[in-house]
């Protein structure tokens, strides 16, 4: 059940924007009758009741997402491709197929403390998305410093690493946005594969694009074992693997 969402991003575009009238060059605002219908739908969605819910399985493992995730949809460029959203599925499916629920963490929400509540391990990759603001790295680094475990998967070789953005303009000379993040956590700009300490937390670097975890049969074992080992060391318990999920919502199972 999807019950956590933003009903209408940018309402000013809907109610105050000008839209072309079909078959003419004229523009006008949204028709009054349609705006009334739209507002009725908005109010209904705002009032949908929710209940406490829980998915069985090991909790506290998340995968980082960003608004830029859908920007990199060019199928093939300079010999690099990410077919069928494979980099995202490479981070999530190896866990889901073992019965481990995955929490999706939105980078744009990192300024809010509630974003990291209950989170022990965060997996991320810049192979399929890029940070739109450098400030997000401050929040990620601070979470690690306080005890979080960050697992970075990626070779940083996709062509989008070289687009003109904040990490390579205005005096910044980073070859990839991850270099800025690693530097924030007192690591070298391009650390090799391995485990590093930062404050009370840990940074684990895996130099393989996550798409390979699903595009190559049986290639997700190392990825899973890395997460399982990190979880065991932090929590003192083994990750629970199973072949099913049970959703408990209110009085229902």
Locations of regions flagged by a protein language model:
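Hydrophobic targeting/anchoring helices
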Residues: 1-90, 188-194, 203-247, 253
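Short, well-ordered alpha-helix to beta-strand connector turns
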Residues: 2, 118-121, 147
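Acidic-and-aromatic substrate-binding clefts and catalytic sites of carbohydrate-active enzymes
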Residues: 13, 110-113, 128-134
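Extracellular/periplasmic catalytic domains that process cell-envelope and extracellular macromolecules
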Residues: 54-58, 115-117, 145, 196-198
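A short, well-structured beta->alpha microelement
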Residues: 93-115
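Short, well-ordered secondary-structure micro-motifs within conserved domains or adaptor modules
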Residues: 116-128
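Catalytic-core regions of glycoside hydrolase
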Residues: 1-10, 96-103, 127
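A conserved amphipathic helix/loop scaffold
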Residues: 126, 130-253
């Amino acid at each position: 059940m999807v019950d956590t969402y933003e009903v209408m991003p940018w309402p000013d575009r809907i109610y105050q924007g000008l839209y072309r009238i079909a078959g003419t060059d004229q523009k006008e605002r949204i028709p009054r009758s349609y705006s009334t219908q739209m507002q009725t739908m908005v109010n209904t969605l705002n009032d949908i009741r929710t209940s406490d819910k829980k998915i069985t399985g090991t909790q506290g493992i998340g995968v980082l997402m960003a608004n830029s995730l859908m920007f990199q949809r060019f199928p093939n460029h300079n010999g690099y491709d990410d077919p069928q959203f494979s980099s995202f599925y490479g981070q999530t499916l190896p866990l889901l197929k073992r019965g481990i629920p995955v929490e999706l963490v939105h980078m744009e929400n990192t300024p809010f403390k509630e974003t990291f509540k209950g989170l022990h391990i965060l997996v991320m990759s810049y192979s399929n998305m890029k940070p739109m603001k450098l400030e997000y790295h401050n929040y990620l680094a601070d979470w690690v410093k306080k005890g979080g475990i960050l697992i970075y998967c990626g070779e940083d070789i996709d062509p989008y690493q070289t687009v003109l953005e904040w990490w390579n303009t205005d005096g910044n000379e980073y070859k990839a946005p991850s270099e800025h993040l690693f530097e924030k956590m007192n690591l070298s700009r391009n650390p090799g594969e391995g485990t590093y300490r930062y404050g009370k937390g840990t940074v684990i670097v895996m130099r393989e694009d996550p798409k390979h975890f699903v595009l190559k049969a049986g290639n997700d074992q190392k990825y899973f074992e890395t997460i399982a080992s990190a979880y065991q060391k932090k929590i003192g318990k083994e990750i629970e693997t199973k072949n099913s999920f049970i959703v408990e919502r209110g009085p229902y199972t």
